[in-house]
Amino acid sequence: MVTGGTGFLGRHVVESFTKKGYQVIALVRDIQKANKIQQLQKAKIEHCEIYNKNLSYAFPVNSILIHCAWGDVKDSMSPNHLELNLPDNYRFIKNAVEQKKLSRVVISGSCYEYGLKYGPVFASSSTKPNTPYAIAKVKLHKNLVKLQSKSNFKLTWARLFYMYGEGQDENSIIPLLKKAIRNGEKKFNMSYGEQLLDYMPVEIAAKQFLSLIEIDPGTYNICSGSPISLRRLMEQIMSEMNKNIELNLGYYKYRKQDSIAIWGADPLNQIF
């Protein structure tokens, strides 16, 4: 069972599992939107208002819940992460595990939980969140660990690094670059592009969830382990498109809440 199936990551997680022959139920709030998403076509799509306080959804016996849903992901500084997303997501997951029908719960976390770390980080590295989004994720993780002592369920926490690909928000930097190239623009405004970050195609990140349901529960980084500068990634995208555009470096300042260099030190393919 996958929540957030119409989202950027969720749709690719659903497709990864259906391609491997799993029976997948995609819990969505917008059936019409879900029916238009190619990656969901082999899944069973069910309407579910997961944040409804009166939700009475019955989970199938021995099912696996992969929770990708989260609101306001475009704005990491929104107070809604702590005021709405944290309690709403905890209530939904608590309700799910207390039915005692789930064999495992996999939750999508974020590398932003580490805060302004510089360099490689392990899944065991300390967290120091510095945005409402990251703080809410860390608190949810801690609350679920406490809940385990009462409800005894298998919990896997997956900290995602930087992803790109089909379904990404059109206002993210890579879709904006592609749009500028398609529109024949001469320049593309960006920062200096010196950020050294752990980027991976969303399809590869989604496939790693297949491993997460088979290995021991715990906390893992969903990462490539190979950092690349943002400027180099932009050049790589242009090369793949066989197009060129002048990168107007330094037009934007670096965001104070974002790490200038962070990558996962323990990708799953090196652990197992």
Model region roles, listed by residue range:
Residues P132, A136-K139:
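Active-site helix of classical SDR
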